[in-house]
Amino acid sequence: MSGKPAARQGDMTQYGGPIVQGSAGVRIGAPTGVACSVCPGGMTSGNPVNPLPGAKVLPGETDLALPGPLPFILSRTYSSYRTKTPAPVGVFGPGWKAPSDIRLQLRDDGLILNDNGGRSIHFEPLLPGEAVYSRSESMWLVRGGKAAQPDGHTLARLWGALPPDIRLSPHLYLATNSAQGPWWILGWSERVPGAEDVLPAPLPPYRELTGLADRFGRTLTYRREAAGDLTGEITGVTDGAGREFRLVLTTQAQRAEEARTSSLSSSDSSRPLSASAFPDTLPGTEYGPDRGIRLSAVWLMHDPAYPESLPAAPLVRYTYTEAGELLAVYDRSNTQVRAFTYDAQHPGRMV
């Protein structure tokens, strides 16, 4: 380029803050590539604020991680940076991202992988069984539909370890950034068809993260809701050790009703909470459209190693403001371990 250091969106700076401005699109399959940096050779300071776009960023915080093979790890990251084409708000509220916030868009002219860092990575269309490698992102994308990769292929052993139903399905896509794995399995969530739907229903023009698979063939599965207000949202996880987790999700209307009921029964409240103070729906913000669905708690429902010793309380619990912003995090002892404050004039902007 110009002899200056290059970086792309999502890379970490010297002082620990990730770059959140710059090109979020990388074309894979083109004869040449372009690397963008926020400010080649420039000075940066301030933690956790990125001084260039003025965005506050928090690196990943892990709320849940039990030991074992291919465990379910629940973490979250925050950035106040708002893109011009934001993805829908996730289950932690505006500005927050979870590891499962990954989607692959299927278009006539190509594939777009939206990762959990807000980037859009472009690939050429793939035939069944075809694989492509992004040198700039160090990432493989492979379409299912092939029993084995050619001998000597970088992914031959990792591909062969996948269960046959995953390897042979041309409707599944898999991504990985290492020949050692794991795979991100990109499929679609089942849903209950409506009375007006034509059957069989066509597959959606996108794929969502439905699970992980490691080089030993073990899988982690995300279960998504098939009907109702939570359609498409993750409500259950089974990890590589066979443990089953239940993710309790709430809607904005449910949280508003609970808050109003609590205010009526509280001796500290002189008047009931009004609908305007805690609305039943959330307007769209600069962070994207918002269905108002939030993760409330995570329960361990089954553990093959300790079937009779399940915890009587959730492993982690979350509370939210009336604007749907993540307010506090509580551990399994119901101790508050994190709390957050936001700008009242700008929903989702942490202060």
Positions of predicted regions on the chain:
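Intrinsically disordered, low-complexity segments enriched in small residues
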Residues: 30-83
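Short, polar loop/linker segments at the starts of domains and inter-domain junctions
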Residues: 83-97
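Intrinsically disordered, low-complexity proline/glycine-rich segments
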Residues: 1-49, 306, 313-318, 337
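Extended charged/polar low-complexity repeat regions
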Residues: 92-94, 109-351
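N-terminal targeting and processing segments
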Residues: 76-77, 98-101, 133
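Short alpha-helical segments and helix-capping/turn motifs at coil-helix boundaries
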Residues: 56-61, 97-99, 105-109
